[in-house]
C-alpha cells in the first residue's frame, strides 16, 4: 500500500467520522426534543481534538517518516480497521436514535441490551480502541498509535465513568 493509498484510507475514515457527526447531530436534536439531558460535556472538546489528531498524526507520520508499507503488519491492521468500522456501525444501528458522540440520556427510554450490547457494556469504545492503534499501524505509524492509545485510555476512563453515571442517574 503506497502512501497515497494510505492517505485515501485515512480520508475514508475521516469521511466516516463526518457521517457519524451528521447522525449524532440529528440524534441530539431528537433526544433534546424528548427531554434528553447531556452530561459529561467537559471532556468532549478534548475527544474531538484527540480523534482529529489521530487522523492528522497518521498522515503526518507516514508522509514525514517515509516508512515503507510492511504487508505482514499492514494487512492485518487494515482488517482490524474494517472490523472496527463494522462494530461501530453495528452499535449505531442497535442504539438507533439513542446513539450519539455526546452523552445524552432521554428519560424513560430503556437501556439497550441487544446487538453488541448483549456482549459488552461499551462496544463502541472497543471499536475506537481497535481503530486507534490499527489505523496508524496499517502503514507503520507506531508513534501515532502509541500516543493516541495512551491519551485515549485516559479519555475513556473519564468518558465511561461519565456515561455510566448518566445512565445510572436516569434509572433512579
Regions found by a protein language model. Give the residues of each.
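Feature marks short, highly hydrophobic, charge-poor N-terminal signal-anchor/signal peptide-like helices
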Residues: 1-5
